[in-house]
Amino acid sequence: MGKRAKMIAKIKELMEKYDRIRNIGICAHIDHGKTTLSDNLLAGAGMISKELAGEQLALDFDEEEAQRGITIFAANVSMVHTYEGNEYLINLIDTPGHVDFGGDVTRAMRAIDGAIVVVCAVEGVMPQTETVLRQALRERVKPVLFINKVDRLINELKLTPEELQSRFIKIINDINNLIRKMAPEEFKDKWLVRVEDGSVAFGSAYNNWAISVPFMKKSGITFKDIIKYCEEDRQDELAEKAPLHEVVLDMVIKHLPSPPEAQKYRIPHLWKGDLNSEAGKAMLNCDPNGPLAGVITKIIVDKHAGAVSVCRLFSGRIKQGDEVYMVNNQQKAKIQQVSVFMGPERIPVDSISAGNICALVGLKEASAGETICSPDKIIEPFEAITHISEPVITVAIEAKNTKDLPKLIEVLRQVAREDPTVKVEINEETGEHLLSGMGELHIEIITKLKIERDAGIPVEVGQPIVVYRETVTGQSPVVESKSPNKHNKLYFVVEPLEESVLQAYKEGRIPDVDTKRKLDDKIVQELIKAGMDPEEAKRVMCIYEGNVLINMTRGIVHLDEVKELIIQGFKEAMRNGPLAAEKCQGVKVKLMDAVLHEDAIHRGPAQMIPAARFGIRDAMMQANPVLLEPMQFVYINTPQDFMGAAMREISNRRGQILDMEQEGDMAIIKAKCPVAEMFGFAGAIRGATQGRCLWSIEFAGYEKVPRDMQEQLIKQIRERKGLKLE
């Protein structure tokens, strides 16, 4: 039996021992060393050859990733590690750190129970570290800390042992402050990372060594030895004495939970069904003999197998030929193949049981976030996976050859299924395909990689367009609106939605709702908690994309029969704002009164939808409407000498500097800029700092467009959309 075959046999055996499984992720800021760490862990566990590790970036197996030197898609791999005489199976997901790919990170968090947070010792805790940690804690994922690039503190920055210590203490305190701030109540103290119990490790992923307090006690190596090895350039010897994989994987096994342990507190948070039901109990206990329940966290498209779904099973087991039911899609599918991951390869297995992460072939229509169960025991779906960012840039895309059009439509649908942070729509008037993403790099990866390289369709990509929103800032008077046949009248008032309610909607605490009957009491309570007037909250008819329609009427005959049509009109008004036909957000529409014709034939869709739509639009025009533009936080890390140039670059783009820190000879600038001004920023900032800065961006919500620009901007958008210019 070759080494590889032994490894596969081991993995198959351990998959059935639930307390010996660890599902973990590695998360960090871009370039802090995630992928190098995961490769060297793989090499240590005998999965790829040692000579290549660190250079090979086994998990960056997409040629585009290897070229750019950044991880774009989350990759999966399984490995075996022995700790205190027992063997453990570790399923590792490497997630991207670049901000344009935040969606991948959020989805990976659903599949794992613990995370190694990697922080670069030189740069410290960065904005993206904070974002990723927040996502982990929100999904109830327990963290441990690995401080990377320690050799650079010793060799490049020449820090003394005292300075080293204070640098480490600062990083650990920063991480613990974030955990205190963001962890769920019951874990605020339990989950803090501590040097003394070994939930913090230090080392150099690139040079393949690491150290932790338990390992020092076990091996007798001290911090002084480490400084000596680094100064004398004998890090390869150090890697033999204190191997990275041993220290880090020991920490993972000791401090991160097994599936049965983690599911006890994760399931109540992730799944809103009845925990006392058969499925609920099976998931809490990670029971392989219970009803099937799993969540699909990612779709990978394979040239040979088609769509491969990455799935975390919470209960039951799944084997080839099984029929499963997809809850969100409401359809059945047959599993053609079940396999586990080893880097870029999938190894077919007979069956997979609860607690494991696997790859399934055969779920053609599945999208990320889908819940799967068995057709005879249908369960409640898992909560929608909430993404922190939303698409802010749109490009028009068309095939260079008309014959590629059907193929292009298929690829765009597939991309939207794989990545929920991408939106694809067809502009009805112009017939263009519009692709929206989270930033320039995100869009470029999709068009160059997924469409041109993988699908082989040459495309023309239009100029990037910024996605604006509309809202109101004042309250309108009561506006009367008549149906086209003049037999029905609706009376509306429009005002801004409470800021706190909009925030709760964005964080996913309040869902989209259409109600024909009474609103679910849970949602009413959430609305009141978020600051809505209790009387209004009880009368909500519809919540749609951050706008709310409230029925303030009393005792109107026939109103129930036209409710759906009024909701339809409200949605149309919210999709096309009055200023520039952009989507609205944060608008509260109240239906104050209605006079309806008693004959149903005179209050059909052709009468009621326009009455609602135009009435709401007129009311918005009298409620001081404004245009909102998307903003981004910009974080720049630059040498002091280039600080002025970097700040000029920001202020030339209507940016505001929010914060500035100095650490050694580096300046850290935190600013906020409109997305509209950020095109071409990558090249400009490189030029301004002679390529010596690191920068990243993060979505920062929508803000009002400056008044002096609004009129011109509305004119431009209307012109682009071919609307009348009045």
Curated annotation (Swiss-Prot):
Q: Which one of the record's GO molecular function terms can you name?
A: GTPase activity
Q: Name one GO biological process term.
A: translational elongation
Gene3D superfamilies from the UniProt entry: 3.30.230.10, 3.30.70.240, Elongation Factor G (Translational Gtpase), domain 3 (3.30.70.870), P-loop containing nucleotide triphosphate hydrolases (3.40.50.300), Translation factors (2.40.30.10)
Residues annotated with Diphthamide modification: 602
Short name of one Pfam family = EFG_III
Q: Determine if Cytoplasm is one of this entry's keywords.
A: yes
Q: Could you list this entry's UniProt keywords, alphabetically sorted.
A: Cytoplasm, Elongation factor, GTP-binding, Nucleotide-binding, Protein biosynthesis
Q: Which GO terms describe its cellular component?
A: cytosol; ribonucleoprotein complex
Q: Boundaries of each tr-type G domain copy?
A: 19-260
Quote the SUPFAM superfamilies the UniProt record gives. Answer: EF-G C-terminal domain-like (SSF54980), P-loop containing nucleoside triphosphate hydrolases (SSF52540), Ribosomal protein S5 domain 2-like (SSF54211), Translation proteins (SSF50447)
Q: Where in the cell is it found?
A: Cytoplasm
Q: Which residues form the signal peptide?
A: none
Matching entries from CDD domains are given as:
aeEF2_snRNP_like_IV, EF2, EF2_II, EF2_snRNP_III, Elongation_Factor_C
**Keyword check for Glycosyltransferase:** no
Give me the residues that bind GTP, please.
28-35, 94-98, 148-151
Similarity remark: Belongs to the TRAFAC class translation factor GTPase superfamily. Classic translation factor GTPase family. EF-G/EF-2 subfamily.
Do you know which PANTHER family this protein is assigned to? Answer: ELONGATION FACTOR-LIKE GTPASE 1 (PTHR42908:SF3), TRANSLATION ELONGATION FACTOR-RELATED (PTHR42908)
- Extract the HAMAP family matched here: EF_G_EF_2_A
Write out the function statement from the record: Catalyzes the GTP-dependent ribosomal translocation step during translation elongation. During this step, the ribosome changes from the pre-translocational (PRE) to the post-translocational (POST) state as the newly formed A-site-bound peptidyl-tRNA and P-site-bound deacylated tRNA move to the P and E sites, respectively. Catalyzes the coordinated movement of the two tRNA molecules, the mRNA and conformational changes in the ribosome.
User: This protein is called what?
Assistant: Elongation factor 2
Q: Which organism is it from?
A: Methanocaldococcus jannaschii (strain ATCC 43067 / DSM 2661 / JAL-1 / JCM 10045 / NBRC 100440)
Its ancestry begins with: Archaea, Methanobacteriati, Methanobacteriota, Methanomada group, Methanococci
